[in-house]
Curated annotation (Swiss-Prot):
The keyword Phosphoprotein applies. Processed into N-terminal 27-kDa and C-terminal 55-kDa fragments. Residues 556-689 are annotated as: Interaction with HIF1A. Belongs to the CEP135/TSGA10 family. Residues 659-670 have a biased composition (Polar residues). Its main location: cytoplasm. GO terms for cellular component: centriole; cytoplasm; motile cilium; neuron projection; sperm fibrous sheath; sperm principal piece. This is Testis-specific gene 10 protein. Expressed in the testis, in spermatozoa (at protein level). Expressed in actively dividing fetal tissues, including sternum, intestine, limb, kidney and stomach. One of its GO terms (biological process) is spermatogenesis. InterPro entries: Centriole_BasalBody_StrucProt.
Length: 698
């Protein structure tokens, strides 16, 4: 179990797991230390019990030796008394004493047997204690080795944690640098986004102004178209009326010429008649006499004159009718003049509207001062209508090319939008990589700048187109002025009206074509404006997404800061834990040293106990020898007692007493070295016990 625990912290783990493993190792080491302390306390208690048992056995042995010596002294005393009073009447008392001695001997035998059994049990206990001591010693040595391994592992882990701490510090410094760079980049991106917002706002304002101008121009163009249509219709009506009037004028002129011819004929006839009258008056005066003769001729002439008067009356009536027709024609001419004046007024209103448009476009000019020179050059270059028509054709071609280029640009923008969508998906997939996000943001900013430049170029192109439309309107205005001049000239020269009408029709056809082209260009511009609105909305969405990404980056920055603070707190906690683990290791080392000292003391105690055991073995062998000696002595005493009984029976006390005294002397001589021999191991045991007590006190 301890080997598996010591190998487990070698695995690479995070700081929290390492801290938990350190806490678990500290807990296990404290538990092992407490268990070892408990084992040592149990072992010490067991040793104290063994020592107490040894002391009790020593005290019992001393008591037995004292009792044995007392019994021997009593036996010797009784023998002496028996020797002294062998023939006295106190033999009964001697027999009683012998019986008592025999009973005491039996008790001593039982005590010896009990002592032998206790000796065997003590031997077994000593063997068991030695085996347990050796096992505990091996277990403690193994535990000490395992603890040393754990200490080495803890040192290795501490070194690994120190290296990890250094690596974490380096990573923290690099992350802080990256955070600072990211913060700088975020600030740069924010400033760039603010600048782009300002540019976009300015572009929006310009776009709104252009939209307003375009809406105004479209309204004015619609009004002008409607007015042009009305003028065209009026011009067509006027052309028809002029044609009718010209026809009527031609017919009336022909009639007037006929009537003039008739009037001339009549005048000639009048002159002839007056001449005739003069001649006739002269003839009457000369031929007064021939009146009677010529009354018939006069009556006939009167009839002729009446007829002539009737004819003259008819002529006067015809003249009156002609005068009425002339007055009516004059009225019609006045009406045509009034209509032409109304047309002139309408043209003046159109001119005034055009002046207002010119003023509005002058305001647009003031906004686009950089292009005023080009406008003046183009205004100076586009004075003639034919050149303007050619220029308008060229401009139409240019507009077509521009539309084609804008369509290609729209396609490119659609491709860019698809690419942007794909990039957005890639951004969503790669949102975790801050550096890649920053690079993509930079690329997006560059593309946004390029697109802003493109939008600026498109706005410039739109301004150019507006200026071209202004030029076209100016050309229209010049055409209208020429038409006004032509109408004024029509009043002076009706014959040139047809030619001017043809030119006006050509101009109107060109203006119609231009209006159609302007309508198509307006529709294209509306489409472009819608596309640009969509693009602006896309850009706004992209800006919103960029803002959201920036907010996400800020939140990531805040989370990283919080994680940094947590890491710092973990580092501080790890440092505290390392300090505590170092303190615990020092305590463990001190405890291990104490355990080593206890083991040394235990080994010394074991050595002392082994010595004591050897001494006990020697004592046991001595006791066995003493028991053999006591058995021999008892055998000899039995033999002596039997002999004494036989001698008492034989009542040969004197000879037997002398013989017994002679036998007792060598016995006493034999007992004296035995006593010395018995006392010598007692003294050795006392010395060994005193040494054990000294070691224990130490």
């Amino acid at each position: 179990m301890m080997r598996s625990r010591s190998k487990s912290p070698r695995r690479p783990s995070p700081t929290a797991r390492g801290a938990n493993c350190d806490v678990e190792l500290l807990k296990t080491t404290t538990r092992d230390r407490e268990e070892l302390k408990c084992m040592l306390e149990k072992y010490e208690r067991h040793l104290a019990e063994i020592q107490g048992n040894v002391k009790v056995l020593k005290s019992e042995r001393d008591k037995i030796f004292l009792l044995y010596e007392q019994a021997q002294e009593e036996i010797t005393r009784l023998r002496r008394e028996m020797m002294k009073s062998c023939k006295s009447p106190k033999s009964t008392t001697a027999h009683a004493i012998l019986r008592r001695v025999e009973t005491e001997r039996d008790v001593a035998f039982t005590d010896l047997r009990r002592m032998t059994t206790e000796r065997d049990s003590l031997r077994e206990r000593l063997k068991i204690a030695q085996e347990t001591a050796f096992n505990e010693k091996a277990h403690l040595e193994q535990r000490i080795e395992e603890l040393e391994c754990t200490v080495h592992n803890l040192d290795d882990e501490r070194m690994e944690q120190m290296s990890n701490m250094t690596l974490m510090k380096e990573t923290i410094s690099t992350v802080e640098k990256e955070m600072k760079s990211l913060a700088r980049k975020a600030m740069d991106t924010e400033s760039e986004l603010g600048r782009q917002k300002a540019e976009n706002n300015s572009l929006r304002l310009l776009y709104e102004n252009t939209e307003k101008d375009l809406s105004d121009t479209q309204r004015h163009l619609a009004k002008k178209k409607y007015e042009l249509q009305l003028t065209q219709e009026k011009i067509m009506c006027l052309d028809e009326k002029i044609d009718n009037f010209t026809r009527q004028n031609i017919a009336q002129r022909e009639e007037i010429s006929i009537l003039g011819g008739t009037l001339n004929d009549l005048a000639k006839e009048k002159e002839c008649l007056q001449a005739c009258l003069d001649k006739k008056s002269e003839n009457i005066a000369s031929l007064g006499e021939s009146l009677a003769m010529k009354e018939k001729t006069i009556s006939g002439m009167k009839n002729i004159i009446a007829e002539m008067e009737q004819a003259s009356r008819q002529c006067t009536e015809a003249l009156i009718v002609c005068e009425q027709d002339v007055s009516r024609m004059r009225r019609q001419l006045d009406e045509t003049n009034d209509e032409l004046a109304q047309i002139a007024r309408e043209r003046d209103i159109l001119a005034h509207d055009n002046d207002n448009l010119q003023e509005q476009f002058a305001k647009a000019k003031q906004e686009n001062q950089a292009l005023s020179k080009k406008l003046n050059d183009t205004h100076n270059e586009l004075n003639d209508i034919k050149q303007k028509v050619q220029d308008t054709n060229l401009e139409v071609n240019k507009l077509k090319n521009i539309l084609k280029s804008e369509e290609s640009e729209n396609r490119q923008m659609m491709e860019q939008l698809r690419k942007a969508n794909e990039d957005a998906e890639n951004w969503e997939n790669k949102a975790r990589q801050s550096e890649a996000d920053n690079n993509t943001l930079k690329l997006e900013l560059i593309t946004a700048e390029a697109e802003g430049n493109r939008l600026k170029e498109k706005v410039d192109s739109l301004n150019r187109e507006v200026e071209q439309h202004l030029n076209a309107e100016r050309s229209y205005k010049s055409q209208i002025s020429t038409l006004h001049k032509s109408v004024v000239k029509m009043e002076e020269e009706l014959q040139k009206v047809q030619f001017e009408k043809v030119s006006a029709l050509a101009d109107l056809s060109s203006t119609r074509e231009l209006c159609i082209k302007l309508d198509s260009s307006k529709e294209l511009l509306n489409r472009q404006l819608v596309a640009k609105d969509q693009e602006i909305e896309m850009r706004e969405n992209e800006l919103d997404s960029a803002h959201s990404e920036i907010e996400l980056l800020r939140s990531q920055m805040a989370n990283e800061r919080i994680s940094m603070q947590n890491l710092e707190a973990l580092l501080v906690a790890n440092r505290d834990k390392e300090y505590q683990s170092q303190i615990a290791l020092q305590e463990k080392e001190s405890e291990i040293q104490l355990l080593k000292e206890h083991l040394c003391l235990a080994e010394n105690k074991m050595a002392i106990q082994s010595r004591d055991v050897a001494q006990f073995r020697n004592v046991v062998t001595q006791l066995e020898a003493d028991l053999d000696i006591t058995k021999r002595q008892l055998g000899t005493e039995r033999f002596e007692r039997e002999r004494a009984v036989q001698e008492l029976r034989r009542q040969n006390y004197s000879s037997n007493a002398y013989h017994m005294s002679s036998t007792m002397k060598p016995n006493t001589k034999c007992h004296s070295p035995e006593r010395a021999h018995h006392r010598s191991p007692d003294r050795g045991l006392d010395r060994s016990l005193e040494e054990n007590l000294c070691y224990r006190d130490f």
